[in-house]
């Protein structure tokens, strides 16, 4: 794989992504790097090497489009774009969409769209569906205003509501799959 997990835009820059694992400050003219793992609120980080392996193994030979119903970080979109594929991601937070779209601007066919996945169905058919969905009440996802957007799965008050919205997002994604393609759900 050409995408290493320790280098690349997924390391974040100036807090632009939820995958920031280090923070740099300047004190007395010296750059100090803090690499503790809690700088991003202990958000999980999707491994770009795993993304590349998934795209290369599960994309059909003539496939061109990847859809991610629970967008999150930049990794899968950046890797898909780098491999020459179109990529669309549904993401409920505008700040995450803006950060990821800025990081992937060199790939014109890679886009994060602000939408509630449980209510959104893409207009095109897709050759690979990939999801690394949120876990119930494990992480807190916030937008520019410091609040979780309405419909953000981790902010729902019951597991049943979380499950139902998650599964509706999956159903919407399944409805736009081309025949003989894969839906990959990555957990853990």
Regions from the language model: what does each represent?
Residues 1-60:
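S-adenosyl-L-methionine
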Residues 39, 43, 89, 154-161:
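Pocket-edge positions in alpha/beta enzyme catalytic cores
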Residues 48-120, 128, 173:
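Conserved S-adenosyl-L-methionine
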Residues 43-47, 71, 165:
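Short secondary-structure boundary/capping elements
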Residues 125-169:
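Mobile active-site "lid"/loop adjacent to the S-adenosyl-L-methionine
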Residues 62-63, 170-172, 177-183:
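Short glycine-dipeptide loop
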Residues 69, 133-134, 179:
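Proline-centered helix-kink/hinge sites
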């Amino acid at each position: 794989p050409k995408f290493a997990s320790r280098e690349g835009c997924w390391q974040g820059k100036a807090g632009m992504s939820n995958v920031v694992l280090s923070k740099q400050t300047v004190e007395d003219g010296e750059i100090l790097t803090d690499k503790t793992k809690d700088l991003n609120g202990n958000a999980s980080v999707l491994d770009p090497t795993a993304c590349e392996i998934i795209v290369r193994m599960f994309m059909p030979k003539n496939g061109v489009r990847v859809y991610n119903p629970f967008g999150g970080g930049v990794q899968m979109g950046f890797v898909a774009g780098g491999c020459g594929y179109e990529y669309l991601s549904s993401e409920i937070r505008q700040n995450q969409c803006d950060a990821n779209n800025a990081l992937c601007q060199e790939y014109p066919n890679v886009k994060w769209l602000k939408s509630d996945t449980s209510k959104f169905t893409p207009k095109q058919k897709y050759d690979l569906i990939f999801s690394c969905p949120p876990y119930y009440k494990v992480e807190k996802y916030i937008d520019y205003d410091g609040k979780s957007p309405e419909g953000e799965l981790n902010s729902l008050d019951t597991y049943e509501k979380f499950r139902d919205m998650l599964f509706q997002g999956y159903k919407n994604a399944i409805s736009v799959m081309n025949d003989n393609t894969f839906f990959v759900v990555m957990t853990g």
